[in-house]
């Protein structure tokens, strides 16, 4: 486990340095106590906090969802919040499922399949079945990463359906495990600093799969229905129950603005946020704890049919107190999102309009005109804030000093 010792300094050339020490890396991270520039702090002798860590202990984030439910898009939004593009390991297996950015490493839990595609077919199990996955290895390796140790992680090749040779994964600042089972095994679940579940309703999932598999892959409607029905028992048994453990759930439902809509193009999206989670304060609309319905369409927000409706209020979810923010409808102009952003609180933004900026930056991503993109972006900002508060606590410095 990482050992961090804070001490004070009046000046330093670099805000973060790496110093060789007895065969391991020693990181020094500097936290300034005021928002003024580093130069003015030094000039006036203001104290800064310098934190020396023998090994940086990553925070671990879990993201659970069924296949084809937007995990990859969410990861692209999340890594963008922290800066730097997420790319496969350089010089590694071209079919690797891992993505690495400046601060974040994302691994796909499909890599812990214990059976290849042929093996699953022979045994009559799906990839959703725990019997087709190695949870002991998953736990051991996630635990090792959290302790700051490198691992040799297996690779499941989605192209060939085979188990490829392992790849070396170094501990990052933020380690994200995404896939079918991040919260299934209690041992793995307890390693998570924060967890998210993407809950796509059956109606929307079916509409999305038809759009993707018929239009892009040439599958018949009958084969799509058969595929969904074949997976449903295992999904209901092993994947869906994980949402009760998630700290935040993004639930995607059919719109209520269009009667009997079954196309899945206009969506109603809920951000369900647990109360009482350390370092996580739920986002709220207008007045925290109140029950509010808001139709923002008008002079400051362009809305074509069927319009936009926001709702917010307290609720219970699997017996736990939650706050729920809901958006039904879609944006016509993303630049006008700033009007909505200005009425939301606890966003954990660095500056006014950061949510809107992130949404405009990735306007071509799926869901950018509705609540899926908006709430994924907000959760990404909340995870950044959570990371900063965790490292501040570990270093023994004020939380404000860790803001970057």
Swiss-Prot record:
Q: How is its activity regulated?
A: Light regulated via thioredoxin by reversible oxidation/reduction of sulfhydryl/disulfide groups.
Pfam families linked to this entry: PRK
Tell me which Gene Ontology terms the entry assigns under biological process. reductive pentose-phosphate cycle
User: One GO cellular component from the entry?
Assistant: cytoplasm
Return the transit peptide range from the UniProt record: 1-53
EC assignment: 2.7.1.19
Subcellular compartments = Plastid, Chloroplast
Q: In which pathway does it act?
A: Carbohydrate biosynthesis; Calvin cycle
Cystine bridges: which residues?
Answer: 69-108
Q: Which molecular-function annotation in GO is an example for this chain?
A: phosphoribulokinase activity
Gene3D superfamilies membership = P-loop containing nucleotide triphosphate hydrolases (3.40.50.300)
Enzyme class, first EC level, given as a word: transferase
Task: Tell me yes or no: is Transit peptide among this UniProt entry's keywords.
Answer: yes
Reaction catalyzed: D-ribulose 5-phosphate + ATP = D-ribulose 1,5-bisphosphate + ADP + H(+)
Q: Which UniProt keywords apply?
A: ATP-binding, Calvin cycle, Chloroplast, Disulfide bond, Kinase, Nucleotide-binding, Photosynthesis, Plastid, Transferase, Transit peptide
Family membership, please give it: Belongs to the phosphoribulokinase family.
Q: What is this protein called?
A: Phosphoribulokinase, chloroplastic
> What organism is this sequence from?
Triticum aestivum (Wheat)
């Amino acid at each position: 486990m990482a050992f961090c010792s804070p001490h004070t300094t009046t000046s330093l050339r670099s805000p973060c340095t790496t110093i060789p020490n007895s065969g391991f890396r020693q990181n020094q991270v500097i936290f300034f106590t005021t928002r003024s520039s580093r130069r003015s702090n030094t000039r006036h002798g203001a104290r800064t906090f310098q934190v020396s860590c023998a090994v940086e202990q990553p925070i671990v984030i879990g993201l659970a969802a069924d296949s084809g439910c937007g995990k990859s898009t969410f990861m692209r939004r999340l890594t963008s919040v922290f800066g730097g593009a997420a790319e496969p390991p350089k010089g590694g297996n071209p079919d690797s499922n891992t993505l690495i950015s400046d601060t974040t490493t994302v691994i796909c839990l499909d890599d812990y399949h214990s059976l290849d595609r042929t093996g699953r077919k022979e045994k009559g199990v799906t990839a959703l079945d725990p019997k087709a996955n190695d949870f002991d290895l998953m736990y051991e390796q996630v635990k090792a990463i959290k302790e700051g140790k490198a691992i040799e992680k297996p690779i499941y090749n989605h192209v060939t359906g085979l188990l490829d040779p392992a790849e070396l994964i170094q501990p990052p600042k933020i380690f994200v495990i995404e896939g079918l089972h991040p919260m299934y095994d209690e041992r793995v679940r307890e390693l998570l600093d924060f967890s998210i579940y993407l809950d796509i309703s059956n109606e929307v999932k079916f509409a999305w799969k038809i759009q993707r598999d018929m239009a892009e892959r040439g599958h018949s409607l009958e084969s799509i229905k058969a595929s969904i029905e074949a997976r449903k028992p295992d999904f209901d048994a092993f994947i869906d129950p994980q949402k009760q453990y998630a700290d935040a759930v993004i639930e995607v439902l059919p719109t209520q603005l269009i009667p009997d809509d079954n196309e899945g193009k206009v969506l109603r999206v809920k951000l369900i946020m647990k109360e009482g989670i350390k370092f996580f304060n739920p986002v709220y609309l207008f007045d925290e704890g109140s029950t509010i319905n808001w139709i923002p369409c008008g002079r400051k927000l362009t809305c074509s049919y069927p319009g936009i409706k926001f709702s917010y209020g307290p609720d219970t979810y699997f017996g736990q107190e939650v706050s729920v923010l809901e958006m039904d409808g879609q944006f016509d102009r993303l630049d006008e999102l700033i009007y909505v952003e200005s009425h939301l609180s606890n966003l954990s933004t660095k500056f006014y309009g950061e949510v809107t900026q992130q949404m405009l930056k990735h306007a071509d991503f799926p869901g950018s005109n509705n609540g899926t993109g908006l709430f994924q972006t907000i959760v990404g900002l909340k995870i950044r804030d959570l990371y900063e508060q965790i490292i501040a606590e570990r270093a023994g410095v004020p939380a404000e000093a860790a803001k970057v």
